[in-house]
């Protein structure tokens, strides 16, 4: 059985996660930023038997979102559970044609003595974008989550007697879930932010004497700039800041002045966050780049030249392949994706570009297929492009990512069909209504011709050139 949790980070979300695992069922994580199309697809294709949500969270109009979902697409859904808290809007007796139960009423039930979980029992499904517009379902068993949590906790020092962890990553993703499990494995207190707010985060760090956190480098720099003291967070020792963006040296120097050890890492939903970690007690230039050493000695990383099919020697870049106990069981219900992902000897193709140093340290470079990392989530450009191409005026769309003062954002180019009038505001409004807000392009710009790379076998759009052009256009208009 699968249970969809469409919830923010709350104690109830934590309790429900462990409750589902104890039942021997599987959690399907659903981002609260998702809207009708995404929720319908994930809950429907996963076959989730129950959907649990918080009707009054963040003033989100959940009723309108649910009303836009076709109940017939949710063939497995049997019930809806409302996380009822003070001030929650009235909940109807039925949603999507299914009965609604209140979570508070369930708490009066007798505790279940049995534990149906187990090492090989499926525990968690993460959704991850692929080369098509529909996300894949990454299925993990209990064993990969538990063993990994214990090792990461030790490596990161979360097992220290005075450790307190600040959870800022959403629990629906691999980073947030691993953060939860490492705190539990180490019996370390965790402070939860339901919605990440940098000002509140700074206050919590001071008030709760937080020692460990995951905060992107851009946000942490802004937090430090807003403080009068050079060392505003004396308790904060270690921050995972993977996804570090330029200017690397300036950001890391700011962290060092604040006596914060920031480090990078490598991971993905398929092999879990923090599969490889940069050492903490090493010079700054050894901590700032993506990659690291495997946390579990039973794990392996190798690099393959996809043109020749041969494995690469040290310092030679190619596709990263991984193996070991942190790997997913499979892409659930997706034979085609599994066939493409696994090597014959059981190693997993990541779609990432990188190389190994002679000492075995992984150096991560980028996604091979130019996936977009927006608001900490990996997003397929095809997902954004498909929505833009629904407009009669758009013949073809291409989405890339650019750096802005508010972080990495999507930027789209469209070739017009001539069948209608181009309306940038309407296109962005459509994306905002159908997709999570962070997937909405910051700009949609018409283009006459795509930059192409022509080879004997294929003709490919040069996304790197589009990205450079988009960045230059944005920079020139925001001087």
Segments the model singles out, each with a brief description of its role:
Residues 1-37, 44-47, 168, 378:
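Conserved AMP-binding/adenylate-forming
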Residues 185, 210-214, 224-288, 300:
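Gly/Ser/Thr-rich phosphate-binding loop
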Residues 309, 447-470:
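Flexible lysine-rich "adenylation lid" loop at the C-terminal edge of ANL adenylation domains
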Residues 116, 123-147:
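Conserved AMP-binding A3 loop
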Residues 294-298, 310-341, 379:
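Conserved ATP/PPi-binding loop(s) of AMP-dependent carboxylate-activating enzymes
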